[in-house]
């Protein structure tokens, strides 16, 4: 893994709807608030379902080996659509993409509440992923062009904190609704409609532009840089490890102590509390003191410690503490990754590069069950030790290369 030295941005104006102001304005804060609300829904695409996942597995009689694919299906379509929407942002306008995908998120997500079979829910999850990819590509592209340098890292931290806060609330809400019936959790996707309405009122309307072939060519050149490739691989790795907690921790707690959907929701929420706290108040400071590589290394090592303790922790209070530690690590890793990608991307290619980063993170979540599912099926709790070993290895490599 690698750290990336900052390069001065090229003097090209971004192709997104918003020019980057030198100082935050009232309007930019309003835009930031809308982007955070939209991003919260996108980040909660999996968190809504995770607490009721054991009930879904039981209802459909799914094999434990591949059951995680149901939770992670949306991440594959998110990965694919993030790249497409990122490249289309200059042609269709980021705001237009964002608003339409928010509506799609609400509609497609709600289908899960009425789907009659496993394949219907799976198809619904795939479409939710498409919408989530558009939300993420539009949101992070606009955000990256609102601020520069250290301010961007700080704002990325605020955004990560908001997204993590959403994944505090949504698992608890999903788990609470799941006490009545697991289908009720899918109703939370309907929140995409009011957020789309707020966005329609507050976000500037982008202009339709012609196709931007040079942007695609420029992105291809950037992707040939070894540092960028390593960052994207690390993003995918972090997300794959993240989904070990999302998918297999609830299944383990269900088996070990017959945990309810509400308890699973609180445990998942504790992870998000840690991410919210460190992303809001610590990610930029740790990065400034240790460098991006040092901050990323510290985050991975915290994730490893948390994962290694899961099999031996059965007290609710200790479960929450383990989740909190994992969240602290994840909250250090992600904003520094995205900020590093933004720093080495010219203005005209930044939205596309960050969309690819989002896609790689989603791809990591999708492949997680294929990598760790067989370990869970054959060795049970060894899946947590395996993920911890991978996280520790990535952390050490980043520390050595910082």
Could you tell me what each predicted segment is?
Residues 104, 108-111, 119-127, 317-325:
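Paired small-residue
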Residues 16-24, 204-231:
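Juxtamembrane intracellular "pre-TM" segments in multi-pass secondary transporters
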Residues 149-150, 157-202:
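Helix-loop-helix hairpin linking two adjacent transmembrane segments in secondary transporters
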Residues 80-119:
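Conserved MFS/SLC helix-loop-helix module at the cytosolic interface between two early adjacent transmembrane helices
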Residues 61, 93, 114-120, 148, ...:
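Helix-breaking motifs and short loop linkers at transmembrane-helix boundaries and internal kinks
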Residues 82-93, 278-291, 376:
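Helix-to-loop junctions at the C-terminal end of transmembrane segments
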Residues 118, 124-163:
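Cytoplasmic helix-loop-helix junction between adjacent transmembrane helices
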Residues 344-381, 387:
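A late C-terminal transmembrane helix in Major Facilitator Superfamily
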